[in-house]
From Swiss-Prot:
Its main location: membrane. SNARE promoting fusion of transport vesicles with target membranes. Together with SNARE STX6, promotes movement of vesicles from endosomes to the cell membrane, and may therefore function in the endocytic recycling pathway. Through complex formation with GRIP1, GRIA2 and NSG1 controls the intracellular fate of AMPAR and the endosomal sorting of the GRIA2 subunit toward recycling and membrane targeting. This is Syntaxin-12. The keyword Transport applies. One of its GO terms (molecular function) is SNAP receptor activity. It comes from Mus musculus (Mouse).
Amino acid sequence: MSYGPLDMYRNPGPSGPQPRDFNSIIQTCSGNIQRISQATAQIKNLMSQLGTKQDSSKLQENLQQLQHSTNQLAKETNELLKELGSLPLPLSASEQRQQKLQKERLMNDFSSALNNFQVVQRKVSEKEKESIARARAGSRLSAEDRQREEQLVSFDSHEEWNQMQSQEEEAAITEQDLELIKERETAIRQLEADILDVNQIFKDLAMMIHDQGDLIDSIEANVESSEVHVERATDQLQRAAYYQKKSRKKMCILVLVLSVIVTVLVVVIWVASK
């Protein structure tokens, strides 16, 4: 039975060094988030087959690989978001706002995809643990049972000898079952380690969202401060123009008064000379 390709959810490695600019990181993160969501949907589909007739070692192997590769994709996206936060901001305040909004939207999408993935991870872990519990409970012979029955065995009849051989066959089957149980327990430990990784990613994401909010507040404060400075400069220019106009008016009055005084003096001198 085919369970779908696993490589489609892995981020294809670049053939060479890629430019780490804002837009390329945004694009890579968006693609990763989409793949995480797609992988989560397929994990749910595989999980629904656990404990049914479709359950098999191949299904569990695919489920484990898909879950682990998705976890690695989430860790890669987390590192890219950290790198995104370390890029220098553009000079334009409007471009700064636009980039902040893009990052905020991206982190919200990542948080949502990550939350859905972790919910499915926990459900897979619960199902695997239930499966192991059923397998242990259904084991035909425990080690203590075999030891006790071997002590009670008597070879007085051919029939009892056949019964002992049958028990040994059952014990061999049980050993095989126990080996499968050990494999599942190993897979569960890996799954729980991946769940802890996702928990750490959530902590990092919460910190980045907090820093993002502080940065947006800082940008808005700078924009408001610039607007205040512009308003103050405009007010000062208006005042300067007012004072300059007032000064010119005073100058005109002074010139007019001086003109009148000079005229009066000229008239007085002219009259006196006669």
